[in-house]
């Protein structure tokens, strides 16, 4: 090896990202600054710990490990076996489940694995309609779940935007689905897990609960757990659970656990992402700590405070409030669309997403509402006092937008709110060890 080749080899293992790829480094730096200086209210987002970041950015990314602990198709897996075992045991302890699969790479893949394990193409299943707060993978016509299977969608009552369990029962008895899915992406109220299981048992169906949005609240003891009631429970590991992006499948049924394991590997995935599984294990360990319960209590209290304060400012909250970490704001009374509101709030450094509301007359790209969530800001240390401020800032921007002749005419209001947002976020820094790099 020449000296030049030797130097190149050393640089490969020692040069940091800024040296190797300044363009990517600068984009990442920009995203760090955005997260630091904006108030994150997207309900599906959170902020992970430094420990989770370190686990995900570790040497475990180098290791291929097809199979399961002690049943791998590659050698050299003794340490990743330890990691996956820890992730499995912590997940089981956290949620009180007998079996856990920590390998799903995403929420979509975990739900696909359940379909693969329990259904054949053309079979019938039930799920909450996307327009009522469901998820793409619960039967949307544009998703694989809606293309491969016969989907029966249930919804919410128009008068109170609450799931009509009598309608769920009627549809289930009429259509006899093999699988019923409970859970959603923008439903702000408690779910009646017990009633769903009774309906499933009555028609001989399996009950799948996708608790992706509320898993952290379940772990923290502030939301009823579906694990004692559902045949299978799936969840993403980010959102309110505050881990890396990925999936998790739980069950108390050994036979179903074997079907799930086979569906994940070799049915759907190949080698698992061991660095992500390590980060999941770290996050599960954090969620087992008593402080996570306090965090979960604050998440719900903050969401309720946000909803009540917005109501006091004349905003209509879908279903009248929230039982969890998220709320939907119906903007029709303000003569605004979700798209305009999202953009205006974004310019003021308050990040949220436009979202359809039940029986929405607008298209999905426009919407009549926005979805707001409390997990990320609560992770930063925001309490109810800060969420009262946030609600008033949202009202200031959106009332200004409503009264402006054009979006551009609201610029002064948005910039004034942006300055107030900066004053708040400066009190709650992220990853202080990164700010000097």
UniProtKB/Swiss-Prot annotation:
GO molecular function annotation: glycine hydroxymethyltransferase activity; pyridoxal phosphate binding
Keyword Magnesium assigned: no
Top-rank taxon, per record: Bacteria
EC number: 2.1.2.1
Listed cofactors: pyridoxal 5'-phosphate
Modified residues (N6-(pyridoxal phosphate)lysine): 239
Pathway noted in the entry: One-carbon metabolism; tetrahydrofolate interconversion; Amino-acid biosynthesis; glycine biosynthesis; glycine from L-serine: step 1/1
Presence of the UniProt keyword rRNA-binding in the record: no
Binding locations of (6S)-5,6,7,8-tetrahydrofolate: 130, 134-136
Alphabetical keyword list: Amino-acid biosynthesis, Cytoplasm, One-carbon metabolism, Pyridoxal phosphate, Transferase
GO CC annotations, alphabetized: cytosol
Site (Plays an important role in substrate specificity): 238
Catalysed reaction equations from the record: (6R)-5,10-methylene-5,6,7,8-tetrahydrofolate + glycine + H2O = (6S)-5,6,7,8-tetrahydrofolate + L-serine
One Pfam family linked to the record: SHMT
Chain's role: Catalyzes the reversible interconversion of serine and glycine with tetrahydrofolate (THF) serving as the one-carbon carrier. This reaction serves as the major source of one-carbon groups required for the biosynthesis of purines, thymidylate, methionine, and other important biomolecules. Also exhibits THF-independent aldolase activity toward beta-hydroxyamino acids, producing glycine and aldehydes, via a retro-aldol mechanism.
Family recorded in the similarity comment: Belongs to the SHMT family.
Assembly and interaction partners: Homodimer.
Protein name: Serine hydroxymethyltransferase
The species this protein was found in: Bartonella tribocorum (strain CIP 105476 / IBS 506)
